[in-house]
């Protein structure tokens, strides 16, 4: 596992939870994740859950993605998706507002791998270099991804060659993220 990425993700998650605690006096609250089982759930309200990050349980890799395409996935991506279970976290990188995607549970991890495979299928069909997404943006056609060839974090427009490099590594990207509440 890429320890720098794992440490940077944990540090950002701590910054996010601390900012939430300071603003709201509680652990993060999510309406979107209400009713979805997870080891992260601390308590529930009538229509939302309070969550706390938990250590990832299970095989710490995205080998299903590697097997589906007979490729080696960047070590940073293995770390990103298997360091912890947590809720998605709104954040800002420079001028880019985004939602950092996280795995909520073991079932969610399987779904994420299936979505990553689907993303790669589309890229292969369009003859685009392989990327694996890590965050969404308000414009649903734009995502933040890691280029599987270079390891760079990029902003890309889905289905096109429009790509902008944001950071040289995933650890660097995570270190520069700021919580957005």
Curated annotation (Swiss-Prot):
One of its GO terms (cellular component) is cytoplasmic side of plasma membrane. InterPro entries: Syd (IPR009948), Syd_sf (IPR038228). The keyword Cell membrane applies. Keywords: Cell inner membrane, Cell membrane, Membrane. The keyword Amino-acid biosynthesis does not apply. It is a peripheral membrane protein. This is Protein Syd. It comes from Salmonella typhimurium (strain LT2 / SGSC1412 / ATCC 700720).
